[in-house]
């Protein structure tokens, strides 16, 4: 009753799983990237304003 999968079938299933995971989580990664970019810009602006005050 136990049927084994061949190596190509296992590799295909693994690749499909990885690709599916990347597709599902891509919006989360993009949002994180945008948030980090905005945060860096805010920090840069704050540092520039502090340098002007000094």
Swiss-Prot record:
<comment type="subunit">
    <text>Homooligomer. Interacts (via C-terminus) with endoplasmic reticulum (ER) protein CLCC1; the interaction occurs at the mitochondria-associated ER membrane, a zone of contact between the ER and mitochondrial membranes, but does not appear to play a role in ER-mitochondria tethering and is not affected by ER stress.</text>
</comment>
<dbReference type="GO" id="GO:1900101">
    <property type="term" value="P:regulation of endoplasmic reticulum unfolded protein response"/>
</dbReference>
<dbReference type="Pfam" id="PF23670">
    <property type="entry name" value="PIGBOS1"/>
</dbReference>
<dbReference type="GO" id="GO:0005741">
    <property type="term" value="C:mitochondrial outer membrane"/>
</dbReference>
<keyword id="KW-0812">Transmembrane</keyword>
<keyword id="KW-0834">Unfolded protein response</keyword>
<dbReference type="GO" id="GO:0006986">
    <property type="term" value="P:response to unfolded protein"/>
</dbReference>
<keyword id="KW-0496">Mitochondrion</keyword>
<keyword id="KW-1133">Transmembrane helix</keyword>
<keyword id="KW-1000">Mitochondrion outer membrane</keyword>
<comment type="function">
    <text>Plays a role in regulation of the unfolded protein response triggered by endoplasmic reticulum (ER) stress resulting from the presence of unfolded proteins in the ER lumen.</text>
</comment>
<feature type="transmembrane region" description="Helical">
    <location>
        <begin position="10"/>
        <end position="29"/>
    </location>
</feature>
<feature type="region of interest" description="Required for interaction with CLCC1">
    <location>
        <begin position="30"/>
        <end position="36"/>
    </location>
</feature>
<feature type="topological domain" description="Cytoplasmic">
    <location>
        <begin position="30"/>
        <end position="54"/>
    </location>
</feature>
<protein>
    <recommendedName>
        <fullName>Protein PIGBOS1</fullName>
    </recommendedName>
</protein>
<feature type="topological domain" description="Mitochondrial intermembrane">
    <location>
        <begin position="1"/>
        <end position="9"/>
    </location>
</feature>
<keyword id="KW-0472">Membrane</keyword>
């Amino acid at each position: 009753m136990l049927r084994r999968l061949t190596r190509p079938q296992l590799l295909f299933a693994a690749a499909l799983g990885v690709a599916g995971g990347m597709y599902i989580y891509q919006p989360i990664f993009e949002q994180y990237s945008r948030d980090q970019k905005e945060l860096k810009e805010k920090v840069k602006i704050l540092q520039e304003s502090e340098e002007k005050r000094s």
